[in-house]
UniProtKB/Swiss-Prot annotation:
It comes from Bartonella henselae (strain ATCC 49882 / DSM 28221 / CCUG 30454 / Houston 1). Belongs to the GatB/GatE family. GatB subfamily. Keywords: ATP-binding, Ligase, Nucleotide-binding, Protein biosynthesis. SUPFAM superfamilies: GatB/YqeY motif, Glutamine synthetase/guanido kinase. The gene is gatB. Coiled coil: none annotated. Pfam families: GatB_N, GatB_Yqey. Its EC number is 6.3.5.-. It comes from the Bacteria. GO terms for molecular function: asparaginyl-tRNA synthase (glutamine-hydrolyzing) activity; ATP binding; glutaminyl-tRNA synthase (glutamine-hydrolyzing) activity. The lineage of its organism: Bacteria, Pseudomonadati, Pseudomonadota, Alphaproteobacteria, Hyphomicrobiales. It catalyses: L-glutamyl-tRNA(Gln) + L-glutamine + ATP + H2O = L-glutaminyl-tRNA(Gln) + L-glutamate + ADP + phosphate + H(+); L-aspartyl-tRNA(Asn) + L-glutamine + ATP + H2O = L-asparaginyl-tRNA(Asn) + L-glutamate + ADP + phosphate + 2 H(+). This is Aspartyl/glutamyl-tRNA(Asn/Gln) amidotransferase subunit B.
Length: 499
């Protein structure tokens, strides 16, 4: 099958080699574990973290005479994902046997979908940026297909000095293999694609996206070429399990291939592994072609068929997806594309923001959520679900600023108190005497005192109005940050006789 390159070469994404510029071509095959209580063809549990071989049915262990029974929930989840990817849903698909031998594959074959997948072509829009002008570039990455398949078990090599063991808990767990077109041209684009795909499946509730648990992992296909030429020979980097590692693997592999080609060599089509400790890829085996797996329709499973009404019913139940929420945040709340993009990265963050923003200024709330809340969560290595500051508490802090009860600086201190100690914001302000000083006469006395003690700076400020900020800072310091900043600023300018 001929692959059509739909993207125009862009010099800002070229990689400089010794003999000229190169372009990296990237496609990805992402294995996403479906959220379901039981496996694709058996009733065994899919719960993560159990003792080895505790969630294994006779079907998973490939005992003779045991026939697979398709889990309908897994079918629904695959269709939901396809709809979320704006993809064509195939009303008829076929399960095939993919034949290969591996110790953690008891059947000697994997049940997958080869010729007739459940989901056809779709697309994902990724945003790259911001650039030096604060602008984002939106790039469409095509989805080739999505098909259902079984996961294999897990080989364990660290349990005994001379023997390996097999854990079949994962054997038979339902996977969606989501295959992109080779539309990505940089490590940043690949990372953005993986991030966006993970966000979509999490919003849909079809995969938890926990890469550290292996429930989402990527096979990354990398090749290089001279700009405008035909695609080069690709290498596949298997089972990359973090977004950061995806970027590192691509950057190393592209440089490796460029070095070989510039030295007059040729690229072997092969499967490689990424060594995270060394930051490099290494050869695993020669890359198999489809005929090596001897695909044929599974005789134990009928073709999977459903009608359009089944698809329409699932489409009607889909949640609002990140791209739609982002547009709404920009259009209805006046947020920048950058802020909106951050707020929709996780459904829980978007929900938190919306709760706080209800009846309040969206830009102000976005600033607090992004800079203060997410900053504190990142510092403490917590998830949004673990935040000690509830939407109601943050909303109260913002209300206190708007009412003029506290200043922005006091609000930051109040946020810290609630983060570490909890409590009602209004009650804390009352009990700790945190209200800002709004008495003009009291503020004026503080301004007069500072100016009287710094007559030299007064003279300088009259010549250089920018120095007025020094007086504002001193007044705020003297009043413990409680003076109303706007009132202080106005009085300082009035006393100095500047506009």
């Amino acid at each position: 099958m001929e692959i059509v390159d739909t993207r125009t070469p862009n010099s800002k994404r070229f990689i400089s080699g010794v003999t000229g510029d190169w372009e990296v071509i990237i496609g990805m095959e992402v294995h996403a574990q479906i959220i379901s209580n039981s496996k694709l063809f058996s009733g065994a549990s899919t719960k993560f973290g159990a003792e080895p071989n505790n969630h294994v049915s006779l079907i998973d262990a490939a005992m003779p005479g045991m026939l697979p029974v398709l889990n309908q929930e897994c079918v629904r989840q695959a269709v939901r994902t396809g709809l979320g990817l704006k993809a064509r849903i195939n009303l008829r698909s076929v399960f095939d046997r993919k034949n290969y031998f591996y110790p953690d594959l008891p059947q000697g074959y994997q049940i997958s979908q080869f010729r007739y997948p459940i989901v056809g072509e779709g697309k994902i829009i990724i945003s790259i940026g911001p650039d030096s002008n604060g602008q984002f570039e939106d790039i469409e990455v095509g989805i080739e297909r999505l098909h259902l398949e079984q996961d294999a078990g897990k080989s364990m090599h660290d349990q005994h000095p001379t023997m390996s063991f097999v854990d079949l808990n994962r054997s038979g767990v339902a996977l969606m293999e989501i295959v992109s077109k080779p539309d990505m041209r940089s490590a940043d684009e690949a990372k953005a694609y993986m991030t966006k795909l993970r966000t979509i499946v999490r919003y849909l509730g079809t995969c938890d996206g926990n890469m550290d648990e292996g429930s989402m992992r990527a096979d990354v296909n990398v090749s290089v070429r001279r700009p405008g030429e035909s695609f080069g020979t690709r290498c596949e980097i298997k089972n990359v399990n973090s977004i950061r590692f995806i970027g590192q693997a691509i950057e190393y592999e592209a440089r490796r291939q460029i070095a070989i080609l510039e030295d007059g060599g040729v690229i072997d089509q092969e499967t490689r592994l990424f060594d995270a400790a060394k930051g490099e890829t290494r050869s695993m085996r020669s890359k198999e072609e489809a005929h090596d797996y001897r695909y044929f329709p599974d005789p134990d499973l009928l073709p999977l068929e459903f009608d359009q009404a089944f698809v329409d019913a699932l489409a009607a139940e889909l949640p609002e997806l990140p791209d739609d929420i982002k547009i709404r945040f920009i259009n209805e709340m006046g947020l920048t594309a950058y802020d909106a993009s951050i707020l929709v990265t996780e459904k829980a963050i978007a929900n938190y923001f919306e709760k706080v923003a209800h009846g309040r200024d969206g830009k102000t709330v976005a600033n607090w959520v992004i800079n203060d809340l997410l900053g504190a969560l990142n510092k403490d290595n917590r998830e949004i679900e673990e935040t000690p500051v509830s939407p109601d508490q943050l909303g109260s802090i913002i209300d206190l600023i708007k009412e003029g009860t506290i200043s922005g600086k006091i609000a930051k201190d109040l946020f810290e108190i609630i983060w570490h100690e909890g409590g009602d914001p209004r009650q804390i302000v009352e009990e700790r005497n945190m209200k800002q000083v709004t008495d003009t006469k009291a503020i004026e006395r503080a301004v007069d005192e500072i100016m009287a003690n710094n007559s030299d700076k007064v003279a300088q400020a009259k010549q250089k109005p920018a120095l007025a900020g020094w007086f504002v800072g001193q007044v705020m310091k003297t009043t413990g940050g409680k003076a109303n900043p706007q009132t202080v600023n106005e009085l300082v300018k009035l006393k100095l006789g500047i506009d």
